UniProtKB/Swiss-Prot annotation:
The protein, known as: Indole-3-acetaldehyde oxidase
Domain 2Fe-2S ferredoxin-type: 1-90
Record bears the keyword tRNA processing: no
Family of this protein: Belongs to the xanthine dehydrogenase family.
Gene Ontology cellular-component terms listed: cytoplasm
Cofactor field: [2Fe-2S] cluster; FAD; Mo-molybdopterin
InterPro entries named among the record's database cross-references: 2Fe-2S-bd, 2Fe-2S-bd_dom_sf, 2Fe-2S_ferredoxin-like_sf, 2Fe-2S_ferredoxin-type, 2Fe2S_fd_BS, Ald_Oxase/Xan_DH_a/b, Ald_Oxase/Xan_DH_a/b_sf, Ald_Oxase/xanthine_DH-like
EC number(s) recorded for this UniProt protein: 1.2.3.7
Free-text cofactor note: Binds 2 [2Fe-2S] clusters. Binds 1 Mo-molybdopterin (Mo-MPT) cofactor per subunit.
Domain of life: Eukaryota
Summary of the function given for this chain in its UniProt record: In higher plant aldehyde oxidases (AO) appear to be homo- and heterodimeric assemblies of AO subunits with probably different physiological functions. In vitro, AO-gamma uses heptaldehyde, benzaldehyde, naphthaldehyde and cinnamaldehyde as substrates; AO-beta uses indole-3-acetaldehyde (IAAld), indole-3-aldehyde (IAld) and naphtaldehyde; the AAO2-AAO3 dimer uses abscisic aldehyde.
PROSITE patterns, per database record: 2FE2S_FER_1 (PS00197), 2FE2S_FER_2 (PS51085), FAD_PCMH (PS51387)
Length: 1321
């Protein structure tokens, strides 16, 4: 029997007996085909990078069904008789790019590009769903949701959403952001071609329709029974041989994303139950709806929306469907089944939303039990029963039509609190309530809660009985909520238990309040009425971007180089490079003890796992080499742990196997023997490090300078805040492409390393030092990186070095693609720190002195931590502190060495500054905006704090920008509106904040080479790496401008003749480090120098020519006369100040839901000084993307470690970066067209990192909203309102953090106040 399917219309036929049933579609696509657009990023269905379109033909309906799936979870055998369309299948460079690819490119919606193919397919699927009569009826609402499950770490999502919305039938073209199709204010949409579903490269192939027939697969490991009877026979046979035959029932296999151990289990039998008609049907009768267990959640949603019965009952099904749309992402709902979701809840205690809402709706479950036969159970009975046996099967789920008595009304609502409003996040708690109300009395009700840290969803029967027969009053409400305290109790070990428990009273209050006879008419209003909560506003934006024609094409919004290639998936990343013959694959064994003696390593049961070839450790370092994994100018770090581990996550060994899957599986089977006897306890905090004098030396020239006399400043102060403490945690880089490398041996003891790195030069040095061979034997090649943000600097070196060491030892190519969990654990994150400060200030709010003690956790090794102190102080100096002193200690702990991440140290510095300003404002009872403004720098104070970096007075734009953003954002008007909103809304509070930034950057020596080929085309090499920041694009523009100075015919078309090529450490030496936001400037300066040399060489030819000469003719003559048309140069900023300052301001307004703690960013207005932008489209993308990454740091991303330093939030399930639904709803950016600055590269300034700090405006606005909530709570509790304003809002300000500060008992406090107030009337 064969497995037959198509990929992009190409037929594939595999003998079923030769296919491992556990093989995923992604593995087949990436390792067995040439289609590389499908990317592995998380491997658990949480990111969308691997999304493909799956098409099935229904022979009965003669119809093709198209839907997206996550290929990392979809089993290959599940796609029998299906066509898979990848982004290459939509369009490509050979056959023509699809309009989606062009649109994403034209809207500047692709930066690193790793996520873009998945985005393309997700959008295409949404357009197909909305396709009517060959044109799209997609709405802007549907367009925004099209990519709501796809993650992007670069763009900030705004341009992606605009690209999606550009296909919508109801879009206002003036609402679309900067793009290459039409100008702002243009009303002609003819340049935006309508979507045509037929215009794609690949459609469902006719040959597959003939393949679809019933087959007998019972003799194979993969079985696809066609009836319940056939399935029953298979189950009985498996049960009879259960001691020797393991078995797995397969529907969508999406559970593997959450229960990752399933990947390692090799079952004897996989039984596909999706081809059984009875299990796929949805049947409606007079009693309700019966849904087959393998019906996908997406189909359930569609069916429930179509039910037409009495309005009350119809509303129940509509709300069930709406809630289900928040379960996982669309591409998971398309393949995940309703039965599978409930089985996970029953068997594995999965925190299911489905179980909770169906429990409230009174659902039944029909099962086929191997021991009891056919049974019909209430969902409650099903959940409470002992876990289903492997051979038991859920047949269907029944949802009844509720019939209420005459004159009674049905009320049904569902609720969930989760980090992401649109879904793709497990709930902290979910709930669903059904009530029948006659007149004003509750006849009966069903109250269900789940996902709060309990075995399964439950009904609160005690409260149901209490409410039955009662009219809802404040007193009844209070008593019902009081009863909840003994019911919704999370089990030990549940995260945020108090927060989860506090959500239950809020949800019940919301629901029961709608049933009250006379809803409260108090002022302020309660904010929850009979109307359902309004949906989140759609994303809107504006961009005010100056176009500079002075240095054309520099200054133009040129589309990013290779953006369409990235969208189609043809852009090649390291893991896309075809594996050489005999290639092996590696995976890291890392330490799980912070400080322990390593006794040895073996595998479980002392059996060598399948496919393992070798285990590489420090013992395999060759003679003459060193155990070095990272070597930079200021030090080195070891590749493997020696006799002792120094931190959790430290590399101990490198397992090499015949496949990546076997290597990863072997790591999970590895057992490291540790011993801690006679060892000192590990150092796990900065306090312990200081106590034990475990500190790294800070190089004197990197230690920041203090300003003024703080003792004098403190003496001049009217007020002082002494020894106040701030703690800051970490943040994971979360590039979409994890660490990856490929090492291939070459002749004469040489080796070629393909590395996804920001530092090819340092990778080269590290590999050479480890192998004990000269650096000219090591060639490091990097074409592009799927996101770096600093995480691909130091942390990329040991990955490449391990591959090179294994390749040299085994004399075979070795590659690795580090899985997401390992990457998160071994990469580390931002530097955690503890800050203690004392500050003196006048009664006006003017600050006179600031003293700080800063303890920075560098981890177990130095890395790039030496730069953190100066960066931190640099951003903190954005205010005039009068005098500034500090004692900074770089602490050496037994925690993982920290990575540097976008704005390293700077983002912490800006938070510290804002926390101090907020504290001063609270202590003086003054508006915080007043305190900020009064302490902004003059140019004189700026020069005192920043020395040469301050520049000339005309370069200091911050004070004018502060006023300008106040006007453009209507700040003062909105402050009044926010105040009025807070006075009239009890359960929602708003805050608004204006924040400045100053960001100092350094220029580095940067190499470049420009070569003109005989046909007039141009090749450019630079030391910098394209990470998505538009480096190649700006370099192309600069090359075109600089060579265009010749002003011969054809130079205006030079841009299309230029190609920037990959970085090669042997070809382009002194490449240094791509980071610090100035690589683009430095590279542009370097190629400009090269071009100036070429222009000088070509000028004599032009002068000797008779009349006008074209570019191609000029180059032909140059070749004929042996003119050197290749020029190299090294840009060095030695003749100018090596540093300059970047300025920006932002106003953000937020709204906080006091019941859940959810913060919605209503609007952000950014004004950023880019000088004269080299490419405003690229810089705009950098500003928005950086800001949203900062939003993650300040508001969303919880980096949680256990007491020994092991990362617990190690997956997309637990670590939540921003998504489409968490960015500002109104996102406005203006780029200030700064003046001319001769000492900078064409007067440009950096844009990559500084805007990240502006996200502090969201955090500060949230604090203002929380402050208003705390005032209200103090009033209810009869406490002094001023006590509620003195608090610190931690980072990140997640929902649990915000809710706790607003009051976990806010509902109870309100009701107690209300009852007490009424009793005094």
């Amino acid at each position: 029997m064969s497995l037959v399917f198509a990929i992009n219309g190409q037929r594939f036929e595999l003998e079923l007996s030769s296919v491992d049933p556990s093989t995923t579609l992604l593995e087949f696509l990436r390792y067995q085909t040439s289609f590389k657009s499908v990317k592995l990023s998380c491997g658990e269905g949480g990111c969308g990078a691997c999304v493909v379109l799956l098409s099935k033909f229904d022979p009965v309906l003669q119809k093709v069904e198209d839907f997206t799936v996550s290929s990392c979870l979809t089993l290959l055998c599940s796609v029998n008789h299906c066509n898979i369309t990848t982004s290459e299948g939509l369009g490509n460079s050979r056959d023509g790019f699809h309009p989606i690819h062009k649109r994403l490119s034209g809207f500047h919606a692709s930066q690193c590009g790793f996520c873009t193919p998945g985005m393309s397919v997700s959008l295409f699927s949404a357009l197909l769903d909305a396709d009517k009569s060959q044109y799209s009826d997609l709405t802007v609402v549907e367009a925004e949701k099209a990519v709501s499950g796809n993650l992007c770490r670069c763009t900030g999502y705004r341009p992606i959403v605009d690209a999606c919305k550009s296909f919508a039938s109801d879009v206002d073209i003036e609402d679309l952001g900067l793009n290459s199709f039409c100008r702002k204010g243009d009303k002609d949409s003819s340049s935006l071609t309508r979507f045509d579903s037929e215009k794609r490269i690949c459609t469902f192939p006719e040959f597959l329709k003939d393949e679809i027939k019933s087959v007998d697969s019972g003799m194979y490991r993969w079985c696809s029974p066609a009836s319940v009877e056939e399935l029953s026979s298979l189950l009985e046979a498996c049960k009879a041989n259960s001691n020797t035959v393991s078995m797995k029932l397969v529907a969508g296999n999406t559970s593997m994303g959450y229960y990752k151990d399933e990947r390692e289990q090799n079952y004897d039998k996989y039984i596909d139950i999706t081809r059984i008609p009875h299990l796929k049907e949805i049947r409606e009768n007079q009693n309700g709806v019966e849904i087959g267990s393998v019906v996908t959640i997406s189909k359930v949603i569609a069916a429930l929306k179509e039910i037409r019965v009495s309005p009350g009952v119809e509303k129940i099904f509509g709300k069930l469907a709406t809630h289900m749309e928040m379960i996982a992402a669309r591409f998971i709902r398309n393949f995940g089944s309703i039965g599978g979701n409930l089985v996970m809840a029953q068997r594995k205690q999965f925190p299911s939303d489905m179980a909770t809402i169906l429990l409230a709706a009174g659902a039944f479950v029909n099962i086929m039990s191997s021991s009891r036969g056919l049974e019909k159970l209430t969902l409650e009975e099903f959940l409470e029963r002992s876990p289903l046996e492997a051979h038991d099967l859920v047949l269907s789920i029944e949802i009844p039509f509720w019939h209420s008595e005459t004159n009674s009304e049905l009320f049904f609502e569902t609720y969930r609190a989760a980090p992401r409003p649109h879904g793709s996040a497990l709930a902290y708690l979910n709930a669903a309530f059904l009530a029948e109300v006659k007149d004003t009395m509750v006849v009966n009700c069903r109250l269900a809660f789940g996902a709060y840290g309990t075995k399964h969803a439950i009904r609160c029967k005690e409260i149901e009985e209490f409410l039955s027969g009662k009219v809802i009053t404040d007193k009844v409400l209070y008593e019902a909520i009081t009863l909840l305290g003994n019911v919704v109790v999370p089990e030990d070990g549940t995260s945020n238990p108090a927060y989860r428990s506090s959500l239950a009273p809020g949800f019940l209050f919301k629901f029961l309040h709608t049933l009250m006879t006379h809803p409260t008419t108090d002022k302020p209003s309660n904010g929850y009425h009979l109307d359902p909560p309004k949906p989140l506003p759609m994303l809107s934006s504006s961009q005010n971007v100056p176009i500079n024609n002075e240095y054309n094409p520099v200054g133009q919004p040129v589309t990013k180089v290779g953006a369409s290639l990235q969208a189609s998936g043809e852009a090649v990343y390291v893991d896309d490079i075809p594996s050489p013959t005999n290639c092996l694959y590696g995976a890291f064994i890392y330490s799980k003890k912070p400080f322990a003696r390593i006794k040895g390593i073996h595998f479980k049961d002392d059996l060598v796992p399948t496919g393992v070839v070798a285990v590489i450790s420090r013992k395999d370092v060759p003679k003459g080499g060193k155990n070095i994994g990272m070597k930079i100018g200021l030090g080195s770090d070891q590749l493997f742990a020696e006799d002792f581990t120094t931190s959790v996550g430290e590399c101990i060994a490198f397992v090499v196997a015949d496949t990546q899957r076997h290597a990863d599986a072997a790591v999970n089977l590895a057992v490291v023997e540790y011993e801690t006897e006679d060892l000192e306890p590990p150092i796990l905090s900065v306090e312990d490090a200081v106590k034990k004098s475990s500190l790294f030396d800070i190089i004197p020239f990197l230690y920041p300078q203090q300003v003024g006399d703080t003792s004098k400043g403190m003496a001049e102060a009217d007020h002082q805040i002494l020894s106040s403490e701030i703690r800051l945690g970490s943040q994971y880089v979360f590039y979409m492409e994890t660490q990856t490398a490929l090492a291939v041996g070459d002749e004469d003891n040489c080796i070629v390393v393909y590395s996804s790195t920001q530092t090819p030069q340092y990778v080269q040095s590290s590999v050479a030092a480890c192998l004990g061979i000269p650096e000219n034997n090591i060639r490091v090649i990097t074409r592009r990186v799927g996101g770096g943000f600093g995480g691909k600097s130091v942390k990329s070196m040991p990955v490449a070095t391990a591959c090179a060491l294994a390749a040299k030892k085994l004399q075979r190519p070795v590659r690795t693609y580090v899985n997401r969990k390992t990457d998160m654990i071994m990469t580390g994150g931002r530097h955690p720190m503890k800050i203690t400060y004392s500050v003196g200030f006048k009664s006006t709010g003017k600050i006179t002195a600031l003293e700080l003690e800063i303890l920075i956790d560098a981890g177990a090794s130095y890395g790039f931590s030496m730069f953190i102190p100066s960066n931190l102080i640099g951003s903190l100096k954005k205010y005039n502190w009068g005098a500034l002193s500090f004692d900074i200690k770089l602490c050496k702990t037994n925690l993982l060495s920290r990575a540097i991440m976008r704005s390293p140290g700077d983002v912490q510095g800006t938070y510290i500054a804002e926390a101090i300003i907020e504290n001063i404002a609270s202590s003086l009872s003054l508006e915080v905006d007043t305190i900020r403004k009064i302490n902004l720098h003059t140019h004189e104070s700026l020069a005192l704090f920043y020395k040469d970096g301050a520049g000339e007075p005309h370069e200091y734009t911050l004070s004018s920008m502060w006023d300008k953003v106040g006007v453009s954002s209507k700040f003062e008007e909105r402050v009044s509106v926010v105040r009025e909103f807070n006075e009239s809304n009890m359960w929602r509070k708003r805050g608004i904040s204006r924040v400045p930034i100053i960001y100092e950057v350094l220029l580095f020596a940067t190499p470049g080479r420009v070569s003109v080929l005989s046909d007039g085309t141009i090749v450019v090499e630079i030391g910098g790496i394209e990470l998505g920041q538009g480096l190649w694009t700006k370099v192309k523009q600069m090359t075109s401008y600089a060579l265009g100075m010749l002003q011969c015919d054809g130079t205006e078309e030079l841009l299309e003749k230029i190609r920037v090529i990959q970085s090669d450490s042997l070809s382009m030496v002194q490449g240094n480090f791509t980071g610090g936001s100035t690589t683009s400037e430095g590279s542009c300066a370097a190629v400009r120098l090269c071009c100036e040399t070429l222009v000088e060489r070509l000028k004599p030819l032009m002068e000797r020519s008779d009349g006008p000469i074209t570019w191609n003719e000029l180059i032909s003559q140059a070749y004929a006369q042996s003119v050197n048309l290749s020029a190299s140069d090294l840009y060095t900023p030695k003749d100018t100040p090596m540093q300059y300052l970047n300025y920006g301001t932002a106003v953000s307004e937020v709204e906080v839901d006091l019941v859940t703690g959810q913060t919605t960013v209503l609007q952000t207005d950014i004004l950023y000084d880019c000088g004269k932008s080299l490419n405003p489209a690229v810089d705009l993308g950098q500003i928005e993307g950086s800001f949203v990454q900062g939003l993650g740091f300040f508001m969303l991303e919880e980096y949680i470690e256990d007491p020994e330093g092991l990362l617990l939030t190690d997956s997309t399930w637990t670590y939540k970066i921003p998504t489409v639904d968490t960015i500002p709803k109104q996102f406005n950016v203006e780029i200030l067209n700064g003046g001319c600055h001769e000492k900078r590269v064409l007067s440009s300034k950096a844009s990559g990192e500084p805007p990240l700090l502006l996200a502090a405006s969201v955090h500060c606005a949230t604090r203002q909203a929380v402050k208003e909530a705390r005032k209200q709570l103090c009033m209810w509790k009869g406490e002094n309102g001023s006590s509620g304003s003195a608090f610190q809002l931690p980072v990140p300000a997640t929902m649990p953090v915000v809710k706790e500060l607003c009051g976990l008992d806010i509902i109870e406090s309100y009701l107690e106040w209300k009852l007490h107030d009424n009793s005094n009337l």
